[in-house]
Amino acid sequence: VEDHCYYHGRVQNDAESTASISACNGLKGHFKLQGETYFIEPLKIPNSEAHAVYKYENIEKEDEAPKMCGVTQTNWESDEPIKKTLGLIVPPHGQKFEKKFIELIIVVDHSMVTKYNNDLTAVRTEIYERLNTVNEIYLPLNIHVALVGIVFWSNRDLINVTSSAADTLHSFGEWRGSDLLNQKRHDHAQLLTNVTLDGTTLGITFVFGMCKSDRSVELIRDYSNITFNMAYIMAHEMGHSLGMLHDTKSCTCGDKPCIMFSKESVPPPKEFSSCSYDQYNKYLLKYNPKCIVDPPLRKDIASPAVCGNGVWEEGEECDCGSPEDCENPCCDAATCKLKPGAECGNGECCDNCKIRKAGTECRPARDDCDVAEHCTGQSAECPRNEFQRNGQPCLNNSGYCYNGDCPIMLNQCIALFSPSATVAQDSCFQRNLQGSYYGHCRKEIGHYGKRFPCAAQDVKCGRLYCLDNSFKKNMRCKKDFSYSDENKGIVEPGTKCEDGKVCINRKCVDVNTAY
């Protein structure tokens, strides 16, 4: 695949227009002009540079069956932890968010490899084009999705991929937590399949799942040959991981329906609604997702560079965004090359176009489980964000570090219920010995799968029980449970369950041997 051939932009003299174009082998992509969506692609004529331009409405429909997202959660979790502890008001739609980066791995299952006749280059090219459009969609939220790897299950699937979207998603999440995270660091993983999911389901994910080891995953059915359609489904499911729910009638955007509408729309929407903006903002305030804060290292990005997207990628000397938006005195926005005399144009170790001295702190430690990083004096990039070792005591010995966080039951209760919530008394956790629908440690795959009780020593690694002291509640053994996501409300991996012990795979094990 050629470098520097993926672009975002707009049609000249139309500020409301948008465009997402690949120029790798002719022009291919889409643009929106005066409210209409158009496609452009090369005509398949030998020795010809002719292209076809046509409206979305002229595309032959692939089938008439209505298609839907598999996420069923309809309510945002209680706002109390946000309102009471932070005292913040949700900013208005259209606000400028702080830049976030999602490092994405896409897993291509065996059915997809077969669909493309084992042409892995064709699959890669299609993924690059979809991701180019996803990043165009997420520009207003100031989020960049960086592809850091593609995994092909060329010979066989490594999990059981079935038509049950929920079961496959859970299996994929468990595999990510136990296998994929150990192979390559990333923030979010997508499983791309050609298997028909529950009839009309196009995709499914865990709401609020971003950054969580077994929940920062999504499952996408490759239902359409139209790149735009598939990019929209990717953007929609990723929105759920970032705290967005399906839009209701009160949600507005420039051109309804909006991205988080629950059913497939024709043509697909490209704008997030006022509700999505508010929900994403609340998600950032409540969950403070650390994994999406830092930019990826250039060498980790697996997709071709996009000059003008504001992200410094391999093959670029710098990238300050589009020529219209660039305010960087070191960088030529049109070419993504440094201006004469400049040593650097991007990176935390670049100051006034010069590389900072070795030893200069470029990323301070955020908390007990983080460590500070320092410039090397050789590169404008700040070294990869590193954390304290797993098992390091944190929060005054209340917990142990796990993948850069300090998971403790108290904070999990507060996040689930209210700022006044605390951990329930030990007797509540004895309910996890029942192996019931609500109290268990493990279950078989499937909604009706058998539940297995916790062993006596593992009761604090199953369902989390809290004491909710908020107004008029005072519930002594309160739990959180979701029929669509039965892992919700389970004690998080790495949580301290006893002195010197942590929860790993729903078992309370010695912290010295857990990792």
From Swiss-Prot:
It is found in: Secreted. Expressed by the venom gland. Residues 100-296 form the Peptidase M12B domain. Residues 304-390 form the Disintegrin domain. GO terms for biological process: proteolysis. Zn(2+) binds at H236, H240, H246. Binds 1 zinc ion per subunit. A motif (D/ECD-tripeptide) lies at residues 368-370. SUPFAM superfamilies: Blood coagulation inhibitor (disintegrin), Metalloproteases ('zincins'), catalytic domain. Ca(2+) 2 binds at V306, N309, V311, E313, E316, D319. GO terms for molecular function: metal ion binding; metalloendopeptidase activity; peptidase activator activity; toxin activity. Keywords: Blood coagulation cascade activating toxin, Calcium, Disulfide bond, Glycoprotein, Hemostasis impairing toxin, Hydrolase, Metal-binding, Metalloprotease, Protease, Prothrombin activator, Pyrrolidone carboxylic acid, Secreted, Toxin, Zinc, Zymogen. The modification Pyrrolidone carboxylic acid is found at Q95. It holds the Pfam family Disintegrin. The active site is at E237. Ca(2+) 3 binds at D370, V371, N385. GO terms for cellular component: extracellular region; plasma membrane. Residues 1-94 form a propeptide. Gene3D superfamilies: Collagenase (Catalytic Domain), Disintegrin domain. Ca(2+) 1 binds at E103, D187, C291. Glycans are attached at N160, N194, N225. Monomer. Belongs to the venom metalloproteinase (M12B) family. P-III subfamily. P-IIIa sub-subfamily. Snake venom zinc metalloproteinase that catalyzes the conversion of prothrombin (F2) to alpha-thrombin through formation of a thrombin intermediate, thereby functioning as a procoagulant protein. This is Zinc metalloproteinase-disintegrin-like EoMP06. It comes from Echis ocellatus.
